[in-house]
């Protein structure tokens, strides 16, 4: 029983200490970063003041407004 409690405690501490990776954005297609890679573009900004880096194929197409 003590071993089980110790194992659960260690797993809980490890899950709090190591983040799961970068925050996701734009319907889980983008990642919040300080800088985007060459193959990505900024479309929106994340809540943590980082850029939401999204590959161009996942960004919406620009539509021209008819006048």
UniProtKB/Swiss-Prot annotation:
What residue range is the signal peptide? Answer: 1-20
Which domain of life does this protein belong to? Answer: Eukaryota
Q: Which UniProt keywords apply?
A: Antibiotic, Antimicrobial, Defensin, Disulfide bond, Secreted, Signal
Its principal location? secreted
Q: GO cellular component annotations, sorted alphabetically? A: extracellular region
Question: As annotated in Swiss-Prot or TrEMBL, what is the tissue specificity of this protein?
Answer: Abundant expression in the male reproductive tract only. Expressed abundantly in testis, while expression in epididymis decreased gradually from caput to cauda.
Among the Pfam families in the record, one is Defensin_beta_2
Its subcellular locations are: Secreted
Q: Does Disulfide bond count among this protein's keywords?
A: yes
Where in the chain are disulfide-linked cysteines found? 25-52, 32-46, 36-53
InterPro entries, alphabetized = Beta-defensin, Beta_defensin_dom
Q: Name one GO biological process term.
A: defense response to bacterium
State the family it belongs to. Answer: Belongs to the beta-defensin family.
Q: What does this protein do?
A: Has antibacterial activity.
Protein name (database record)? Beta-defensin 123
Q: Which organism is it from?
A: Macaca mulatta
- The organism's taxonomic lineage, starting at the top: Eukaryota, Metazoa, Chordata, Craniata, Vertebrata
Gene, per the UniProt record: DEFB123
């Amino acid at each position: 029983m003590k071993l089980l409690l110790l194992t659960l405690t260690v797993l809980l501490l490890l899950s709090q200490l190591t983040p799961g990776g970068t925050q996701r954005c734009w319907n889980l297609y983008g990642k919040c970063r300080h800088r985007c890679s060459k193959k990505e573009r900024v479309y929106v900004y994340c809540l943590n003041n980082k850029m939401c880096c999204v590959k161009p194929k996942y960004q919406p197409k620009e539509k021209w407004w008819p006048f």
